[in-house]
Design a protein with these regions (language model features):
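Short beta-strand elements that form the blades of beta-propeller/WD-repeat-like
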Residues: 1-4, 47-61, 101-111, 148
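C-terminal hydrophobic structural anchor segments
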Residues: 68-110
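Beta-propeller blade signature
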Residues: 6-19, 64-76, 117-124
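Acidic, serine/threonine- and glycine-rich low-complexity intrinsically disordered segments
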Residues: 1-49, 53-56
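Repeated scaffold domains used in trafficking and secretory/extracellular systems
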Residues: 31-44, 88-97, 133-147
Length: 148
């Protein structure tokens, strides 16, 4: 049995300076996705989060995490990211996005062509293709800073 929780996949929060979960905040993500759950979540900026989503319910067989979505905490809205390759072509994502100036940069590997870095705008939930790398896969992306 895959599902081991009593609630559907969702979001809870701990307010600043609080010691526990906010009992008045729970957002059911499966209600917004037709029963799909998420595998990972990363903070981007303010109350925007990038989620790695499964393509189908965990109660079905053959599920895979091949979609990205943006969750905004204030509104509780989940929006799938547009501008990425078709989910059936995506074979993987980088382990962790690089975040800078309010944008997330995610490595995307497909079954066609070379992997690429996509810049994701969380406000519009839009990805823009950047550089492609002549490789089979990109596990991560980052930025080197000079030491002072």
């Amino acid at each position: 049995e895959v599902q081991k929780t009593t609630l559907p996949a969702g979001v809870v929060r701990i307010k600043a300076n609080a010691e526990g979960f906010d009992p008045d905040y729970y957002c059911n993500l499966e209600a917004q996705t037709g029963g799909k759950a998420f595998l990972r979540c990363w903070h981007i900026t303010e109350d925007y989060f990038l989620l790695l989503m499964y393509d189908r319910s965990l109660t079905e067989t053959g599920f895979t995490a091949n979609q990205l979505a943006i969750y905004q905490g204030e509104t509780g809205k989940l929006t799938y990211v547009t501008g990425l390759p078709s989910a059936d072509l995506i074979s993987g994502f980088g382990n962790t996005p690089y975040v800078e100036n309010g944008y997330a940069y995610m490595a995307v590997t497909t079954t066609e062509g070379y992997p690429s870095i996509y810049k994701i705008d969380p406000v519009g939930a839009v990805a823009t293709k950047g550089v492609s790398i002549e490789a089979t896969q990109i596990s991560g992306v980052g930025k080197l800073q000079p030491q002072n």
